[in-house]
Amino acid sequence: MTAYTNREAWLLEAVQLLKPIFAAKRHIVPDDCQVSCGFASTGTRSHHIGQCWSRRSSTNERNQIFISPALGDPVQVLDTLVHELVHAVDNCEHKHGKEFKKIALSVGLEGPMRSAGAGKALKEQLVKIADALGPYPHGQLKVHHVRKISAPRPRARCKSCGFEVPMYKKFLTFGPPLCPQHKTEMEQVGPWED
């Protein structure tokens, strides 16, 4: 067992150890995949724990995979890496559609495809691979997902039937709309002025 000093070396070796799982099902993981620890394109605003970019997205024409620095457990990192390698196998062509699902199920992923994770048999293999790789040389980031609190949206309500519609700010200058049932002007509800 090699003691890896950086997470990228660990991740690249993990790809090599995961390739036979794909090869056994006749799927080829590209030899030149690049794997790094980093946030998905949505940054910390989302709960994405991995992302694969297609070859056409990079100037060196290689799939680039990012594993979230919020992950620290080696088996969870490998689980996420398998999911992203499925994307690399089909060069991100099918997102989480039928072709992705076919590949994912064949290598042992389960559950809804957008968040497909290792089934029991695959998880057992991942535990062995994690043991072979040794500790994941990474300090897990404690990321807090802060929800943006938005102001309540202006609305209009019919005085007769209570029918309510949200209003877009650009239409507020025209005044409240008419109730589609009663044909009367609706009352303003919420913040109609900035």
Name these PLM-found stretches.
Residues M1-D73, C92-D194:
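Metalloprotease/metallohydrolase-associated module, dominated by Zn2+-dependent proteases
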Residues D79-C92:
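Active-site recognition of the HExxH zinc-binding catalytic motif
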